[in-house]
A protein has these predicted regions:
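Alpha-helical subdomain
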Residues: 1-169
């Protein structure tokens, strides 16, 4: 995935200091070393963990959130979050395939974005991927109909939702 993203972004010029780092985030020792190094090198960081959180358990997500919030220069964090409803649907549709690849979707907290409050992260904004895809005309006709339905406020519960969330520490 990182090779694909690097290829797409290779000619782009970021408007800030940008680093893409390959690291097995399940290696806690290496992760903590990296966080310390980055915190020492920057004054104000936006951490992006696209595609990561859904593979974690609730406990791992909490640990990760605490570790990030303990660094005073990690001001913002952006990642994609799924609702329990979407997790159930994805497990039903893709579960066997994911298990074959030793990848299991696990994290979709019942309390939604509020899960992260107790770990030092305040949700600033959440954008539905479905609604955003409709706005930029990236959906087929059937999905456009789904995008027209209103979404619940607060925790999404059994409603199938995924979005990108921006948090502040």
């Amino acid at each position: 995935i990182l090779n694909y993203k690097h290829a797409i972004l290779k000619n782009e010029k970021p408007s800030c200091a940008f680093r893409s780092i390959r690291l097995d985030l399940s290696d806690r020792k290496a992760r903590l070393k990296l966080f310390k190094q980055l915190n020492n090198e920057c004054k104000k960081a936006l951490i992006t963990t696209e595609g990561l959180m859904i593979y974690l358990t609730n406990e791992q997500a909490a640990e990760f959130a605490v570790e990030l919030s303990s660094h005073n220069h990690f001001h913002r964090w952006v990642f994609d979050l799924a609702s329990p409803g979407l997790l159930t649907m994805a497990q039903k549709e893709m579960g066997p395939t994911l298990k074959e690849g030793n990848a299991v979707f696990q994290f979709a907290p019942d309390e939604g974005e509020e899960f992260f409050l107790r770990y030092g992260w305040k949700n600033l904004e959440s954008k539905s991927l479905l609604k955003t895809a409709a706005i930029i005309k990236r959906l087929n006709a059937e999905m456009i109909n789904f995008a027209a339905y209103p979404e619940p406020e607060g925790p999404k519960g059994s409603f199938p939702w995924t979005g990108v969330c921006l948090f502040e520490n």
